[in-house]
Amino acid sequence: MELDYLKGHMGNNVIIFLYGDQIPKGRELEAAVEVLQPHRVSGHETGILYPPVRDGDLMVKIVGFTSRAFITACGGLTQVLGKAAVETELGRRFRLPIREPETRIILETDAGPVPITAEVVGGEAKRVWTDMGPFVRECYELGLSRLELKGVPAIKVGKFLVLDGDKVKRHHPEADFESMPVRTQKILLSLQDEFKRQTFSHYHDFSLYDWHPQFTGDLRVLFPHNLATGHVEPACGTGFVATGIGLWELGDLHRQGLTDENGATVRYECGGAPVLVGPELASLDLTCDGGRVTGATFSHSLIEIIEEGRVVL
């Protein structure tokens, strides 16, 4: 099959879009997994786009590199989509309502409708905001729990393992998250395996953070989802949200002075390379009520369209 594609990234979280009307029925997953491979288009997630089936503007089916299966949410995908809708033929292809100074798109996902808002100036998307409310609900539905992984405190947020790098270093002082040598990777893989064992989980969703920002953020974050295969995302929208929920539940956002009467605002340093040093900034706004997170919106400082092309599978 011969497929058109659009490739972009959010802080080096690489997204590939395909068009559902070009894929033979029953081969959607096959096509989505294949284009992610390094010898093909190469990326972290694929979004297969379709016309809406409910009240949204378009629908997406998302496939992850490590899961090799359909997943419910991908924040990076929504950020790239917001930019692509404004700046490429994708917007016209789906007859999306592109307006200045603000374009709002409702994306139908398996987690629910996701509002995406692009700040538009001169035909360019200067900033994109994603409402991650459906993913917040999913996290609480799947459950939160505090864990101890071989002596290292951690928290489970939905599918995610959320881990404080400093707490890892208390037990493994040799760990170096700024260069991520093989020895450090083995430590993280061991902790992730223990997380899966304790939670009876097959998910690879993993957030590693610390409170040592080097630029203008509040903390640093990295997403080493599957170090065994090299699947490390310097930025991850669902990871930003899961980390924020975990830090709210642990009380760390309050202790760091990042909360107010409505919730919290967090700035993550991230992006660039697969290490815990990122020159870019992701902003997360949490809405909280009754002691728990009820909503989340986020935006990343660097979203780029890499290329449009055609691939033969």
Residue ranges and their predicted role:
Residues 1-124, 162-313:
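A glycine-rich beta-to-alpha transition motif near the start of alpha/beta enzyme domains, typified by
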Residues 1-12, 143-157:
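N-terminal, positively charged, Ser/Thr/Ala/Gly-biased leader segments
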